[in-house]
UniProtKB/Swiss-Prot annotation:
Family: Belongs to the CYSTM1 family.
InterPro entries: CYSTM1-like
Subcellular location: Membrane
Keywords on record: Membrane, Transmembrane, Transmembrane helix
The name this protein goes by in its record: Cysteine-rich and transmembrane domain-containing protein 1
Annotated Pro residues bias: 1-45
Gene that this sequence comes from: CYSTM1
Membrane-topology descriptor: Single-pass membrane protein
Principal place of residence: membrane
Gene Ontology CC entries for this record: membrane
Domain of life: Eukaryota
Region (Disordered): 1-66
Comp. bias regions, Low complexity: 46-56
Chain segments annotated as transmembrane: 80-97
């Protein structure tokens, strides 16, 4: 058997043309209509006015003013000189070790 030339199919061919498809509207965005009124009933109080957020917009209740909070350090560090010196020493030691490893 040759792949470019397979043997003919032994079964019977189609006896009649396919039935015509029913005509359907074509185009993007076509969907069948849903149930009237939508799938859920409207809320008992009705819908709020459309197109705007409910709060803080055109007559809605305003947000309360923000409270400013100041954070104050409750303990003053008097050993600033020692801490600065220790930080500088650690930085120098780290740089020296790093320089030694790279060279």
């Amino acid at each position: 058997m040759n792949q470019g030339n397979p043997p003919p199919y032994p079964g019977p061919g189609p006896t009649a043309p396919y039935p015509p498809y029913p005509s359907q509207p074509m185009g993007p965005g076509f969907y069948p209509p849903g149930p009237p009124g939508g799938p859920y009933p409207p809320p008992q109080g009705g819908y709020p006015y459309q197109g705007y957020p409910q709060y803080g917009w055109q007559g809605g209740p305003q947000e309360p003013p923000k409270t400013t909070v100041y954070v104050v350090e409750d303990q003053r560090r008097d050993d600033l000189g020692t801490s600065t010196c220790l930080t500088a020493c650690w930085t120098a030691l780290c740089c020296c070790c790093l320089w030694d490893m790279l060279t």
